């Protein structure tokens, strides 16, 4: 079974480690962040 994509709007101090952990476990990510 494929994993559900997870979306993040802004990574910041909390979202960055969460996104890295999800990527490590094979979740496809959709990320929007303004630099």
Curated annotation (Swiss-Prot):
Biological-process GO terms, alphabetical: valine catabolic process
Claim: Heme is one of the keywords in the record: no
Any Pfam family: NAD_binding_2
GO molecular function: 3-hydroxyisobutyrate dehydrogenase activity; NADP binding
Transmembrane segments: none
Localization in the cell: Mitochondrion
Signal peptide: none
InterPro entries: 3-OH-isobutyrate_DH-rel_CS (IPR002204), 6PGDH_NADP-bd (IPR006115), NAD(P)-bd_dom_sf (IPR036291)
Keywords annotated in UniProt: Acetylation, Branched-chain amino acid catabolism, Mitochondrion, NAD, Oxidoreductase
Record GO cellular component, one term: mitochondrion
N6-succinyllysine, modified sites: 24
Domain of life of the native organism: Eukaryota
Catalyses which reaction(s): 3-hydroxy-2-methylpropanoate + NAD(+) = 2-methyl-3-oxopropanoate + NADH + H(+)
Pathway this chain belongs to: Amino-acid degradation; L-valine degradation
The protein's assembly and partners: Homodimer.
Annotated protein name in UniProt: 3-hydroxyisobutyrate dehydrogenase
